[in-house]
Amino acid sequence: MNVLLCSINTLKRLYDISAVEVGQHFYWQIGGFLVHAQVLITSWVVIAILLVSAFLVIRNLQTIPAFGQNFFEYVLEFIRDVSKTQIGEEYGPWVPFIGTLFLFIFVSNWSGALFPWKIIQLPHGELAAPTNDINTTVALALLTSVAYFYAGLSKKGLAYFSKYIQPTPILLPINILEDFTKPLSLSFRLFGNILADELVVVVLVSLVPLVVPIPVMFLGLFTSGIQALIFATLAAAYIGESIEGHH
């Protein structure tokens, strides 16, 4: 009898977990539009963290940097190295864009593991990391697509479109399709990894004591950082590809 009750309780917990739907959202009605409030709230929190951190560091710059300034200088140097490696000698104007992508995704990913979003009650759905929502990752991927089109057109003008018939016009459909698969792969890779990590943690916390999921949480922090680096590196690589005209 006890075994049966335990099995029923376990199945009930699994059913409760399965009720967390990716499409269950909280909306604001603004005029005639429905605004996805969950993503906006968590994104504003992440942006506020980045802006406040940057303000605290740059308000009192010193020749001999303290810990905060030294850390930000290291991050900036790291982003510059990634940009230069992937884009080439014309990397300078693109450092702010690549850096913004990396820092926003990095802090967003970590916020999902470190912030107690779920204690904030909403009428519908629940708060989570911004990158846990497909709308955010698709928006970031589309921004990247706009960036590498702009990079190619500003460097080569209309001659940029000649790449679609190189090395032979037969590859025209494939080259066009590639421009659609790039943002799709960027967005779904990031979304899938972050969503899977959070779901694994939720399932483990529901089924086993809290101590057991802790290693998975630390692994999630590591993979979250890696995903931010992969996204920023690929974005820089696509921009460099548009500028240099090679694959």
From Swiss-Prot:
Coiled coil: none annotated. It is a multi-pass membrane protein. Disulfide bonds: none annotated. Keywords: ATP synthesis, CF(0), Chloroplast, Hydrogen ion transport, Ion transport, Membrane, Plastid, Thylakoid, Transmembrane, Transmembrane helix, Transport. It is found in: Plastid, Chloroplast thylakoid membrane. One of its GO terms (cellular component) is plasma membrane. The chain crosses the membrane at residues 38-58, 95-115, 134-154, 199-219, 220-240. InterPro entries: ATP_syn_F0_a_bact/chloroplast (IPR045082), ATP_synth_F0_asu (IPR000568), ATP_synth_F0_asu_AS (IPR023011), F0_ATP_A_sf (IPR035908). Its main location: plastid. Key component of the proton channel; it plays a direct role in the translocation of protons across the membrane. Belongs to the ATPase A chain family. This is ATP synthase subunit a, chloroplastic. It comes from Phaseolus vulgaris (Kidney bean). The lineage of its organism: Eukaryota, Viridiplantae, Streptophyta, Embryophyta, Tracheophyta.
